[in-house]
């Protein structure tokens, strides 16, 4: 659920 460098499903 993060949209930093890599959109992972974690914070």
UniProtKB/Swiss-Prot annotation:
- Keyword Secreted assigned to the entry: answer is yes
**GO biological process, alphabetically ordered:** neuropeptide signaling pathway
The record's listing under InterPro entries reads: Periviscerokinin
Compartment(s) of residence:
Secreted
Lineage runs: Eukaryota, Metazoa, Ecdysozoa, Arthropoda, Hexapoda
Keywords of this protein's UniProt record, alphabetized?
Amidation, Neuropeptide, Secreted
Tissue-specificity statement: Expressed in abdominal perisympathetic organs and abdominal ganglia.
UniProt protein name = Periviscerokinin-1
Q: Does the keyword Protease apply?
A: no
The UniProt family comment states: Belongs to the periviscerokinin family.
Q: What is the documented function of this protein?
A: Mediates visceral muscle contractile activity (myotropic activity).
Q: Which domain of life is it from?
A: Eukaryota
List the GO terms this entry assigns under cellular component, sorted alphabetically.
Answer: extracellular region
Modified positions (Threonine amide) are 11
């Amino acid at each position: 659920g993060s949209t930093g460098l890599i959109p992972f499903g974690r914070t």
